């Protein structure tokens, strides 16, 4: 009797353990992402822990939960709790009296605005705005960089270098800087676009100042400058921290180099020259398999092999015929990279060699002058396969597809917003997207 009980207990325990392992492997135990706090999502890698999505999308379009009129801009959307935060540009037209007190003339006030909406209703919770004339800034629709939410604060950077740290509760200011006036900043041709990066208790930003003021690190709580490094001009790419041999370095892609600096003090570690036309170092570097990959437009892609020591790195391969990205962020999975090439569309290639396997012949998004699609990997609840993506293309179409080394296959497509280059946010079973006129919250169809 006692032995039988023990046997049953052991068997039950083994079954429970086995079920737990299966649950982890199949995704049943996965925690869904309720927040999208930074550029490219909770892990900063363009992956979304999502519910299992249905392939059957309504012909009349996906249901819009709410829509809110906003101003222009390319800034992505960030979400924490019930707060949806992004940036736009507001132009206030008016009149002012001339000195004689009788005549009037037209006036225009240009503002950059950080604003917060309620996730459930779209109602505005707060807004923080400041004067920011754009002058002759090209593509001057509005701010470019997605807000960075960290705990109870949100960090933003405007197109011409206004860096703000705000309280997420009410939008009141904690600290602020003007990168151009205060730190020798040189805005890129199309304005600052790299979001602030939080590393430990530092806020890392690209200023592009000479004399060692390209990369700046500020104290997260006080805004005090802690260190500064490099003298390159600023690009548009997000710095990436990586841990190697017990040491953290920041990989930075500037218009003239692929570099790494010490994440704690800014000390330069290694540098590979790579001059990009018009300074368009845009996409965030992909770092896997001891390789740092950047994908440029006119001069193509470069893969850097990271050495054993923090100061060592060498060019592994380069390719400038088939692998030429611009704004669209490439994604990586299991040894392969998926890049939106300017001519051939979504393209799959091997990270280790740069060997191209296929392209989708511009199926995901139209070719156009500046092809764009914001692509995320789906880690879907209850699915064992890991090769599904969601992409918001330049036409405002949301596309559900399967992509792997074997090819590209579309499952569903629905237009949810006007043409846009801005990155959306994915939370729960919703996608939030913005254009120059509105911000929408759309519910996605979840499989039974």
Where on the chain are the PLM-derived regions?
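N-terminal secretory signal peptides that target proteins for export/translocation
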Residues: 1-7
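Bacterial N-terminal signal peptides
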Residues: 10-25
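Noncatalytic, solvent-exposed loop/strand surfaces
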Residues: 27-448
